Amino acid sequence: MENSAFFYGVFLWCLLISVTGYSIYIGFGPPSKELRDPFEEHED
């Protein structure tokens, strides 16, 4: 019983780290060049 809780914790930790890493890659990596900036589109 204690062993399965440990593996669930490790799985959730790895999932959190991978989602965070992917978000940083999309936000600041090479794919960020394709993102649009709504503030630059509507400048007065």
Curated annotation (Swiss-Prot):
Signal peptide start-end: none
Keywords of the record: Chloroplast, Membrane, Plastid, Thylakoid, Transmembrane, Transmembrane helix
GO BP, sorted A to Z: photosynthesis
Location in the cell: Plastid, Chloroplast thylakoid membrane
Keyword Transmembrane: yes
UniProt-listed InterPro entries: PSII_PsbN (IPR003398)
Pfam families registered for this protein in UniProt: PsbN
Membrane topology annotation: Single-pass membrane protein
GO cellular component, one term: chloroplast thylakoid membrane
Transmembrane segment boundaries: 6-26
UniProt cross-references to HAMAP family, sorted A to Z: PSII_PsbN
Function: May play a role in photosystem I and II biogenesis.
Family: Belongs to the PsbN family.
Designated name of the protein: Protein PsbN
Species the sequence originates in: Ostreococcus tauri
Higher taxonomy: Eukaryota, Viridiplantae, Chlorophyta, Mamiellophyceae, Mamiellales
